[in-house]
A protein has these predicted regions:
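Small/polar-rich, solvent-exposed N-terminal microdomains that initiate assembly or binding
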Residues: 1-67, 112-123, 168-175
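Oligomerization/assembly interface segments of phage tail-like spikes and tubes
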Residues: 68-87, 145-160
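Acidic-leaning, charged glycine-interspersed low-complexity segments
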Residues: 23, 47-52, 96-159
């Protein structure tokens, strides 16, 4: 079963975010991560290792028909940075962190989806790999050093039901 449009967009972000947060614990895949940023902009101090999650533009998976069920694709980009004294070591550590981000999502998304949605409901169809690439370096404030950054992009393929959304709005108007 699918979920309605209103629930769908919010839940996709929440499921991906919680998939990473589940591994930020002791003995988790991401236990060494000091800063996890699940929002588009950040003005706070960042400690490394850092993972910055960006939800990108949602597009229809095939022809968009708003009269019923629609498959959508929402890419998420994760920018990862780790400091090491030697730049080559930092590069390897940053790539390793990007790999662990993908593994964290792979490990947790189905369990978290089943906890977040009503029994029998399914929203995320699958998650596919889109891109993995070095993004360059970022400057560390107050230091002459730079951190290498690696990005990994995963596409979340999910299903929403426009009609279910309309029925829910119509049914709630009398309340």
């Amino acid at each position: 079963m699918t979920v309605n449009l209103v629930t769908g967009f919010d839940k996709v972000h929440e499921i991906i975010k919680q998939s990473l947060e589940a591994e930020l614990t002791e003995n988790g895949l991401l236990e060494d991560v000091e800063t996890f940023i699940p929002v588009y902009t950040n003005e706070e101090h960042v400690d490394e290792p850092v993972v910055w999650m960006h939800q990108l533009e949602t597009i229809p998976g095939r022809q968009a028909d708003i009269s019923g069920t629609m498959e959508l694709t929402t890419p998420f980009q994760f920018n990862c940075a780790v400091y090491e004294v030697e730049i080559e070591d930092a590069n390897i550590a940053t790539q390793n962190l990007a790999n662990r981000v993908a593994l964290s999502i792979l490990k947790n998304w189905q369990t978290i989806q089943s906890q977040e949605l009503e029994p029998g409901k399914r929203m995320i169809k699958n998650i596919t790999f889109q891109r993995y690439y070095p993004l360059g370096t970022i400057e560390v404030n107050g230091k002459s050093e730079r951190l290498p950054v690696t990005g990994i992009v995963l596409e979340v393929h999910h299903i929403v039901n426009w009609q279910m959304c309309c029925r829910n709005l119509t049914n709630n108007q009398g309340d």
